[in-house]
Regions:
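Conserved histidines in hydrophobic membrane contexts and catalytic metal-binding motifs
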Residues: 1-232
Length: 232
């Protein structure tokens, strides 16, 4: 047995011992993900739950005067007109993220008051609200770093059999997450272990990316060593 083969045996044995449970978990969680994804609010759901604009005809400015407020050089991908605490607001999806501008440039952006919070929640679930938590840090169901700008975030619990929860941004009342008990259960068996979606790790995008890359690299090295040992 030459030196390279001995090295490959050692690499395969050590990495196999360390990573076997991880790879078994990754393999089994992939089956769960074929039927259950990580709960997220889709763009279609958001469109369906948007507050109704006044049918009496709110006075809206010319769209060119609104786009003139965008930073120079920004390219607009899509535009949504919605109500923010009763005020018409344009949301522009751009190359620099989503930018929000009230139709009336003379007023400041309103805060999300209790009345608007409850009205928005009712659009998502008709059951009574049992509790509202004010979050100042990310949790397991909103572990993404880009949501930090929405802080504080309101977590709303509904009194229904499904265990429904809704997360709303305090900045504009946008729904950030909407899930029930069943979706959260399957996420623990599928998406969370498969994508390493643990809050403490996923909220740090750089660390999470490096962790996934290193685990992938070590897994590939283990497989290559195993193939070498088999062929040799």
């Amino acid at each position: 047995m030459n030196v390279i083969t001995k090295l490959m045996y050692s690499i395969h044995r050590i990495l196999g011992t360390l990573l076997c449970i991880l790879f078994l978990m990754w393999f089994l969680s992939a089956f769960v993900m074929m039927y259950h994804r990580f709960p997220r609010v889709s763009a279609k759901e958001k469109m369906q739950k948007l507050d109704m604009l006044s049918q009496t005809g709110d006075s809206l400015p010319d769209i060119s005067s609104v786009t003139a407020r965008l930073p120079r050089g920004v390219k607009v991908r899509s535009t949504i007109l919605n109500l923010n605490a009763g005020h018409p607001e344009f949301s522009f999806s751009t190359t620099k993220g989503t930018l929000h501008f009230l139709a009336d440039s003379t007023i400041s952006r309103p805060s999300l008051d209790s009345e608007h919070l409850h009205r928005t929640a009712a659009l998502w679930c008709s059951s009574p609200i049992t509790r509202i938590d004010t979050l100042h840090s990310l949790d397991q169901w909103i572990p993404f770093a880009e949501l930090k700008k929405e802080m504080p975030i309101y977590k709303i619990y509904f009194a229904d059999d499904a265990g429904t929860q809704l997360y709303l941004s305090s900045q504009n009342g946008e729904a950030l997450q909407f899930s029930n008990r069943s979706e959260r259960f399957w996420a623990w068996l599928g998406a969370i272990p498969h994508w390493v979606y643990f809050t403490w790790l996923r909220q740090d995008t750089v660390l999470w990316t490096k962790t996934v890359i290193w685990l992938t690299a070590l897994g590939c090295l283990m497989v290559i060593a195993g193939i070498w040992v088999t062929v040799d």
